[in-house]
């Protein structure tokens, strides 16, 4: 939990990589360094196998959403594009479970926060609506965040 910044937004991003392509946390780091960032711009990265990699400390602003970095936590999941390069919910069951647990933890730490996807990110799939952490009862289905299982 971060005591130095007021967090009111949790943004869910995708790596905008094809479902058939692996994109490791090392490759994400190299990509962000090549773009001139000092490190990975997200606070957390979730790979296809459901591993949650802490990246940037929550106490530091991210580099994932211009104009929102100062008061947000950025989560990125590996994937987001189908085999043809079109936006799709490509999250594995392991990613969905990991995201659910991470969001439960973040919503405990930041109960006033809203959860959303970047509104100006055509590369990531649609379907993540904005909702408040207080409205989330993680035992129930939330089609806002996921596909066939209808759970985050």
Where do the protein language model's features map onto the residues?
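Short, conserved "active-site rim" segments that organize catalytic pockets and cofactor/ligand binding
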Residues: 1-60
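Basic/polar, cationic surfaces and motifs that engage anionic cell-wall
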Residues: 1-11, 15, 48-52, 68-71, ...
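Flexible, surface-exposed loop/gating regions in the mature catalytic domains
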Residues: 61-62, 83
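Ligand-binding face of N-terminal immunoglobulin V-set domains in extracellular IgSF glycoproteins
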Residues: 75
